[in-house]
Amino acid sequence: MISPQRRAEVIEALRRGTVPKAGLDALAVGYGRLQGTLDEELEAVAAGRGAFKAIRGEYGSGKTFFGRWLQERARARGLATSEVQISETETPLHRLETVYRRLVERIATADSGEGAFRGIVDGWFYALERDVLEDTNLDPTDEATLLAKTEALMEARLASVTKVAPAFSATLRAYRRALQANDNATADGLQPI
């Protein structure tokens, strides 16, 4: 059963002639033969393998609907998704830095809509601290030691990233330092996009 709020959101989007952002499972028909294969691919992604899908078709053929339906299924499995529509003026395919920026700006998770990248990075920093506390007999109130051990773990985990994307690693380090110093202006300016 669809809640009244969800029903109103879907109907309002359809009135505007747009694809609803959520609740597409209630409208999806004809995807039965694709569903098993796509679910297998989502499970493979959840297990650590990557996947990329591009959808191409004529105007009105259901590309956006299908993409958003698949994104809903992915987010329900705890995956992050991003949707970018390639266009000659807004996001041209030959401008990869623009495509990348749009992908990162529009990352969404089940817990937060578009713009979830900062939360993902902050969650990674939290996971580092949690891992340090679980692996050692560290006193959680010893902030200096916690910070030092977390920095060491971060460097170990960023080692392979630094080889292929040194600017990204440097931005993560600077962003974390700004957060630790409560320098929100610098942290906001360094969001690793």
Q: Across the structure, where does each feature detected by a protein language model lie?
A:
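P-loop NTPase nucleotide-binding core
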Residues: S61, F65-I193
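Hydrophobic anchor at the beta1->P-loop junction of P-loop NTPases
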Residues: I55
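P-loop (Walker A) phosphate-binding loop of NTP-binding proteins
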Residues: E58
